[in-house]
Amino acid sequence: MRKILYALIACVAFCAQSCQESLEDKAEREAKEYTKSFCPTPTVNYTRTDSVVFYKSTKSYTYYCSFSDAFDNEEIVNKNKQAIHEGIHKMLTDNPGLKSYKEAGFKFVYIVHSTKEPTKILYQYSFSFTK
């Protein structure tokens, strides 16, 4: 009987603790887990995700990426900036996993660096979905 009671108490304590994670804490944890598990990602369409960070102070989910090869060129990026912007916006809009973050007013920031010159920013934009 005592074992069942202790197991029940442990289960209730665990459930209560997991329910207390704020949306900001969840975003921070998920960003860290994604970065640890997947970054840097393989390069696809000349783009690699280097890391993902959630900044609680600004409620910003920030993606740090790099352009490589043909896209690692400021002139080409500038010519295609609108298409890049629209593609990222569509990806964020169509992602159901981000719904609660968008509803909470989180911003999604993309900062894309050059692979050849890592300190050079080729693209940067902050997307907001508040109504």
Residue ranges, per PLM feature:
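Short, intrinsically disordered low-complexity segments
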Residues: M1-R2, I88
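Sec-dependent signal peptide recognition
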Residues: R2-I9
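C-terminal motif of bacterial Sec signal peptides marking the signal peptidase cleavage site
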Residues: C15-S18
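Bacterial signal peptide processing site
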Residues: Q20-S22
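Polar/charged, Gly/Pro-rich intrinsically disordered segments
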Residues: E24, E28, K32-E33, S37, ...
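Short, non-transmembrane amphipathic alpha-helical segments
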Residues: N73-K99
